[in-house]
């Protein structure tokens, strides 16, 4: 076994060692996701989801090809590992992967616009705090 030095990047997660703790980020993954979805030059959203939003399976018209919706939701599920601020929105949107509609897709785009405005958000684990629950 070979020591490769300090950990900087693992499974798409960027790890930065700071004097007072560790920062875990997926900024590169976020920017790549935005580029793949074609949302690099759009306006941003202040929140990932509207307050008190109630989505139903019957909202909107069915998407002709739901694979793009499924792919983007899957990418957001992985991104939520280091972005708990989107986890609720991703949870709601993932309920409709079997039959997404135009309304669901519009709300998915809102999450992506939110990420466009906050690509550098990350988790911070302090060296001084206990990791016990």
Task: Describe the residue ranges of each PLM region.
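Long, low-complexity, charge-biased intrinsically disordered regions
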Residues: 1-133
